[in-house]
């Protein structure tokens, strides 16, 4: 099991990455994140929705109502600002993980 503190800060990046692929509603994001991470990332609705609201306030995502299988759902879509933020965070993550791997392996950082 992965220490939850390791996930802090990366959740926004992961959600933006999902939304870069397609617009999604909350439960769909929870399911997709779990699936793509082999159940390593399991978000609860009580964690997800405050993050989505904060991302919307920052202009990283927008939301809209649409019908899915006869049910009204709130979909989220990444904005241009959100794509820029995602690009920055991905670069920061590469630098961070490379530095961690360098220390753990006792040698030079490896390229991805």
Language-model-detected regions and their locations in the chain:
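N-terminal helix-turn-helix DNA-binding core of bacterial DNA-binding proteins
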Residues: 2-47
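Short, contiguous hydrophobic alpha-helices characteristic of membrane insertion segments
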Residues: 4, 60, 110-112
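A cross-family signal for key residues in well-ordered alpha-helices
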Residues: 14-17, 31, 53, 87, ...
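Conserved anionic group-binding/transfer micro-motifs
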Residues: 29, 48, 82, 93
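Basic amphipathic alpha-helical segments that dock to polyanions
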Residues: 48-55
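Beta-hairpin "wing" of winged helix-turn-helix
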Residues: 56-72, 77
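Basic, amphipathic "hinge/linker" alpha-helix immediately C-terminal to the N-terminal HTH DNA-binding motif
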Residues: 71-90
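Amphipathic alpha-helical dimerization/coiled-coil segments
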Residues: 84-112
């Amino acid at each position: 099991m992965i220490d939850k503190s390791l996930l802090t800060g990366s959740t926004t990046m992961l959600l933006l990455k999902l939304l870069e692929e397609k617009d999604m509603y909350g439960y769909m994001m929870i399911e997709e994140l779990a699936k793509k991470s082999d159940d390593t990332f399991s978000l609860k609705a009580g964690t997800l929705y405050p993050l989505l609201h904060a991302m919307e306030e920052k202009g990283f995502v927008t939301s809209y109502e649409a019908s899915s299988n006869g049910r009204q759902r709130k979909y989220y879509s990444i904005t241009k600002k959100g794509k820029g933020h995602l690009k920055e965070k991905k670069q920061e993550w590469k630098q961070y993980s490379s530095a961690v791997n360098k220390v753990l392996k006792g040698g030079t950082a490896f390229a991805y």
